[in-house]
A protein has these predicted regions:
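Cytoplasmic helix-loop-helix junction between adjacent transmembrane helices
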Residues: 114-155
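Juxtamembrane intracellular "pre-TM" segments in multi-pass secondary transporters
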Residues: 1-4, 196-233
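C-terminal transmembrane helical hairpin of 12-TM major facilitator-type secondary transporters
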Residues: 293-340
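Helix-to-loop junctions at the C-terminal end of transmembrane segments
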Residues: 59-70, 278-292, 379-380
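C-terminal ends and interior cores of transmembrane alpha-helices
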Residues: 80-106, 302-316
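A membrane-interface helix-boundary motif in multi-pass transporters
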Residues: 169-182, 377-395
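Hydrophobic core of transmembrane alpha-helices in multi-pass small-molecule transporters
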Residues: 17, 85, 99-125, 320-335
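Short amphipathic helix-loop junctions that connect adjacent transmembrane helices
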Residues: 28-42, 247-264
């Protein structure tokens, strides 16, 4: 059978979109799905963090293997693992465990949820590999615009996923998880049949050394250069801040304002619409006009403003302020994410983009791990608003890290 050929850019975009849909269908419903097991923000943070730290541990291997064997085989491996992890998660939340387990084994379902997140995290290089494919087919001049497609997939996922998840949850709260499993299976079929290879054999690296597969040692190599250290550290701290409060955002809306799954989903749809507009249409012209560095600063300012609005919201003014804060947060994130990623990518060597962007994915995962756990713990101990105040402090540090003309103009060779 002759396979249909599609443009590489479109193939990477569809893969990213399908991956995001599988996650965003479930995301606004997560606290509701976990009610039968736990209501602790700390546990929710650890569940989010477990996925991230597993992704961090696997990121150097995924990046190095994609530079050695090509993008497509690694993408197939990653999506296959996601299928297993999501299906295990769906099975765990669907069973009525009280009918199967004695009291002494009551921790088994929660343990299976953590195992599912570990499996999904270890194989969670879909976004990183797709980002590498986009880097393969783009030039340094249009890389920020190309990376903006990640934001479009992110935005469309947040527009379509939460709405679909909420509609399905009216029949059963676990049905969206099974649909997410279906999206993962479709993604696997799509990657196998339609996604082209973008790394020619004559440009592939040798097998990596054992130390190259250690995520900590890879980060230490990059951090030897002071300018590279500051750029990568800023990337890490930003995602620690951002993913910290997003890990508890649905719980915050549910417990503080009594938001239903429909309202929680609506908040994510707002995020998706704005992210798609900013990263899909505005980011290219804005980068040409202002540059990645200025856009990063502006985006951080928007994120901080959104956090302030969320902390000021109360029962009487909850809906207007909450949605205003969420919208401004989305605007800021839409500016920062592609601008900061392009800023780093453009100043690192174009050789071994898989390893470079794999390390960035690792930093993002490590930041998510620490941010989610810290946010969940502070939510339980210091109150629901504390994660947002922590985000503001971390973002001030990011602004310090990326300040300075030498940092934004000098090229760094990894």
């Amino acid at each position: 059978m002759r396979r249909l050929k599609i443009p590489t850019l479109l193939g990477a975009f569809i893969t990213l979109l399908d991956d995001r849909l599988g996650e965003t269908i479930v995301l606004p419903l997560l606290p509701f799905l976990l009610e039968q097991f736990t209501t602790s923000a700390t546990t929710l943070g650890f569940l989010t963090g477990t996925y991230a730290i597993s992704q961090f541990a696997a990121a150097p291997l995924i990046g190095a293997m994609s530079d050695r064997f090509g993008r497509k085989p690694i993408m197939i491996t990653c999506v296959s693992g996601s299928v297993i992890g999501i299906c295990l998660f769906a099975l765990t939340v669907s069973l009525n465990w009280d009918n199967y387990l004695p009291l002494w084994a009551s921790a088994l379902p929660l343990s299976l949820l953590f195992l599912a997140r570990i499996i999904d995290g270890i194989s969670g290089g879909t976004a990183a590999t797709a980002t590498t494919i986009l880097a393969d087919i783009s030039t340094p001049e249009n890389r920020a615009k190309t990376f903006g497609l990640i934001g479009v997939a992110f935005g469309l996922g947040f527009i379509l996923g939460p709405g679909l998840g909420t509609a399905l949850a009216k029949f059963s709260v676990t049905l969206p998880v099974w649909v997410a499993s279906g999206f993962a299976i479709f993604n696997l079929i799509f990657v196998i049949w339609f996604l082209p290879e973008t790394l020619p054999k004559n440009k592939r690296n040798l097998l990596p050394r054992k130390r190259d597969l250690n995520p900590i040692s890879q980060l230490l190599i990059v951090f030897k250069n002071p300018l590279a250290r500051r750029l990568c550290l800023s990337f890490f701290v930003f995602f620690m801040a951002f993913n910290g409060f997003t890990a508890v955002l649905v719980l915050y809306l549910k417990e503080k304002f009594g938001c239903s799954p429909e309202l929680c989903s609506a908040a994510f749809i707002v995020v998706g619409v704005i992210a798609m507009i900013v990263q899909g249409g505005l980011i290219g012209p804005l980068v040409k006009r202002f540059g990645e560095s200025r856009l990063t600063f502006a985006g951080i300012g928007f994120v901080m403003t959104g956090c302030i609005l969320l902390t000021l919201a109360n029962i009487d003014t909850s809906i207007p302020l909450v949605f205003s804060g969420v919208a401004i947060l989305a605007m800021g994130t839409g500016l920062v994410t592609p601008s900061l990623r392009a800023l780093i990518s453009r100043r690192l060597s174009s050789i071994g983009q898989g390893a470079v962007l794999g390390n960035l994915q690792g930093l993002q995962s490590l930041g998510t791990f620490l941010g989610a756990i810290a946010a969940g713990r502070s939510y339980d101990l210091l109150g629901p608003r504390s994660p947002f105040f922590g985000t503001i402090l971390l973002l001030i540090f990011v602004m310090f890290l990326i300040s300075g003309k030498s940092l934004t103009k000098q090229k760094v060779i990894s």
